[in-house]
């Protein structure tokens, strides 16, 4: 999908993202409220976190530390900025990332990092908080993939505690620990840092990728654009 076709229907979300950093403290307060009520919020039936076995197999044997997937000494770092409710992020997870992981990450050429933004709505906040808990367990990337596989309708209230627990379990995450971590100040700090970094880098839509080589030069790719991402990786080497 081209950058233009990705960005056009998401222009409203892009504008809203610019507001996130300015209201980060307020977002944390809101997150605490919605997280505490997540298990009882009205929501559609919890989708099954399908595809957990092949999803987890993709990550077998790849180290993950502090959310960084791959060999820590890999010469190229790709940081993906996502919103877990973003359908294009889910599409990218299904179509682009498996090949990238097989060909670039498992071979030690690239390592992946992620920043979970939360501009679509409260379900994004709840999901990002539990993703922070998965990061602490070295299972962020399996959690992201499992969430996308079970992704519901935007802002329908589907990201309840029960839904997030199911996703976490399918990704090999200790769900109790992840949901408990989601309520902490440390989880809120992760969200605020992600929002701040997005603003600093001028990231205003998801997915966006920052590709950095050993020289520290950053190449930004916006949207689900495989050709541009491949070119950025080559340029970063």
Predicted features along the sequence, with ranges:
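Conserved strand-loop elements at the edges of beta-sheets that form or border functional pockets
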Residues: 71, 80, 94, 222-223
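Structural alpha/beta surface segment adjacent to cysteine/selenocysteine redox centers
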Residues: 74, 82-169
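Conserved S/T- and glycine-rich ATP-binding loop of Class I adenylate-forming
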Residues: 78, 86, 209
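C-terminal cap of thioredoxin/glutaredoxin-like
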Residues: 2-47, 169-237
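N-terminal low-complexity, Pro/Thr-rich disordered segments
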Residues: 39-63
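Alpha-helical scaffolding within the catalytic cores
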Residues: 64, 96-98, 196
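A short beta-strand-turn-helix
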Residues: 59-76
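A structure-centric signal for secondary-structure junctions around beta-strands
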Residues: 56, 73-75, 127, 205-206
């Amino acid at each position: 999908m081209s950058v233009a076709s990705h960005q056009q229907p998401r222009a409203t979300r892009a504008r809203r993202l610019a507001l996130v950093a300015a209201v980060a403290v307020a977002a944390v307060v809101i997150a605490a409220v919605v997280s505490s009520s997540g298990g009882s919020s009205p929501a559609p039936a919890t989708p099954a976190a399908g595809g957990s076995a092949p999803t987890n197999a993709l990550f077998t044997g790849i180290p993950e530390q502090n959310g960084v997937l791959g060999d820590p000494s890999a010469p190229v770092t790709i940081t993906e900025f996502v919103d877990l409710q973003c359908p294009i992020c889910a599409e990218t997870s299904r179509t682009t990332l498996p090949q990238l992981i097989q060909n670039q990450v498992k071979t030690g050429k690239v390592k992946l990092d992620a920043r979970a933004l939360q501009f679509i709505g409260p379900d994004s906040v709840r999901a990002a908080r539990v993703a922070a808990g998965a990061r602490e367990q070295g299972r962020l990337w399996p959690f992201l993939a499992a969430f996308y596989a079970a992704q519901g309708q935007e802002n329908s209230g589907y990201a309840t505690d029960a839904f997030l627990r199911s996703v976490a379990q399918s990704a090999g995450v200790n769900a109790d620990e992840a949901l408990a971590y989601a309520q902490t100040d440390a989880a809120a700090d992760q969200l605020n840092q992600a929002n701040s970094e997005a603003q600093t880098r001028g990231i205003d839509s998801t997915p966006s990728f920052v590709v950095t080589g050993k020289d520290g030069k950053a190449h930004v790719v916006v949207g689900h654009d495989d050709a541009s991402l491949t070119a950025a990786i080559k340029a970063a080497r």
